[in-house]
Curated annotation (Swiss-Prot):
This is tRNA-specific 2-thiouridylase MnmA. It catalyses: S-sulfanyl-L-cysteinyl-[protein] + uridine(34) in tRNA + AH2 + ATP = 2-thiouridine(34) in tRNA + L-cysteinyl-[protein] + A + AMP + diphosphate + H(+). ATP binds at residues 12-19, 38, 127. Catalyzes the 2-thiolation of uridine at the wobble position (U34) of tRNA, leading to the formation of s(2)U34.
């Protein structure tokens, strides 16, 4: 029988209820648990309050309550170089990035994992809602968790086998209400603390205002696909494919249908808009993705397979056929049915039933072999 007390687990503690309960459960299971708070961003809010300081106070209270040592580590430099610069580069190129995925890949499960191993940890644990399973060959697979509503495999989709084999997800068989109940019964100070939302380095701040601090906005024309000017945009980086809100456009003599963003022309600095949710320009039958990573290891040869996919968080899976090219780690992904608002810069995540296979970054979308969106 395995003696858990000889297995050291470093838990990434954010000050939130999920990571706190993860630490509590591991402690109850007899592991040698060490809590570590990561500071990735100088996140002083608009009131001049550093929210990281408040979160660390919660970490200290929880760690003291459950009886584990705790530390704080600063990864602001790594975050700035590997995540935030990528975020700015993508927006500057007219794409809509997902920095949370890059943060997991480059900071939480890379720099932080290396730090945990330096503390002689056998495993790193997080408060993510995800599940791992080890097969008879010792290969670790990423699976959907019990709580499908909180499933975070989308954000973990670009991790490698070397990373996930060292990770534990204590919440994998729990729902969020169950986690809160455990926290309340244990008397944890953050049992009712609200979940963090949005991009971690923006927090509750206005997105446009935040982005304009780093990327000067350049306004331009809103045009229809045939070039008619119908309005003015505040900067291409503020809009995403399929967006309806915030365009400031009313009905026309021809139609009362709402307007949607259907493309961007970077050379002309034009935002392309069209009326109607079902605009053909919003529907793709294929996408191209790069940086493909598979949890169980990338195939060494070109391969074709059926799967289901998400190309945005909380989206229902859609059926796809994947053509993977081993040399370039790229893929052509063909949709079983035309897919709406496939957005360059976002993540493609592949599934086979309950298993998350991996994913990559969307480079372009196509309809009848014609590139959409002009980005």
């Amino acid at each position: 029988m395995v003696d858990n007390s000889k297995i050291r687990v470093v838990v990434g503690m954010s000050g939130g209820v999920d990571s706190s309960v993860s630490a509590l459960l591991l402690k109850q299971q007899g592991y040698d648990v060490v809590g570590v708070f990561m500071k990735n961003w100088d996140d002083t809010n608009d009131d001049g309050v550093c929210t990281a300081t408040e979160d660390y106070e919660d970490v200290k209270k929880v760690a003291d309550k459950i009886g584990i040592p705790y530390y704080s580590i600063n990864f602001e430099k790594e975050y700035w170089e590997r995540v935030f610069q990528y975020f700015l580069k993508e927006y500057k190129a007219g794409r809509t990035p997902n920095p949370d995925i890059m943060c997991n890949t480059e900071v939480k499960f890379k720099s932080f994992l290396e730090y945990a191993l330096d503390l002689d940890a056998d495993y790193l644990a997080m408060g993510h809602y995800a599940k791992t399973m080890v097969d008879e060959n010792g290969v670790t697979h990423m699976m959907r968790p019990k709580d499908g509503n909180k499933d975070q495999t989308y954000f973990l989709s670009q991790l490698t086998q070397e990373q996930i084999k060292r990770v534990m997800f204590p919440l994998q068989d729990l729902t969020k209400p169950e986690v809160r109940r455990i926290a309340e019964e244990a008397g944890l100070v953050n049992a009712k603390k609200k979940d963090s939302t949005g991009i971690c380095f923006i927090g509750e701040r206005n997105f446009k205002h935040f982005l304009s601090e780093f990327l000067p906005a350049q306004g331009g024309d809103m045009v229809t696909p045939d070039g008619k000017v119908v309005g003015h945009h505040a900067g291409l980086m503020y809009y995403t494919i399929g967006q309806r809100q915030g365009l400031g456009l009313g009905s026309t003599k021809e139609s009362t249908a709402p307007w949607f963003v259907v493309g961007k022309d970077l050379e002309k600095n034009q935002l392309i808009v069209e009326q109607g949710y079902d605009s053909p320009r919003l529907y793709a039958d294929r996408l191209q993705a790069s940086g493909m990573t598979f949890f169980t290891g990338n195939p060494e040869e070109d391969t074709e397979f059926k799967a289901t996919a998400k190309f945005r968080y909380r989206q229902c899976d859609v059926g796809v056929t994947v053509k993977y090219y081993a040399a370039s780690k790229t893929a052509d992904v063909y949709f079983d049915e035309p897919a709406r608002a496939v957005t360059p810069g976002q993540a493609l995540v592949l599934y086979n039933g309950e298993e998350c296979l991996g994913g990559g970054n969307i480079d372009a979308a196509f309809k009848d072999d014609k590139k959409l969106q002009l980005v």
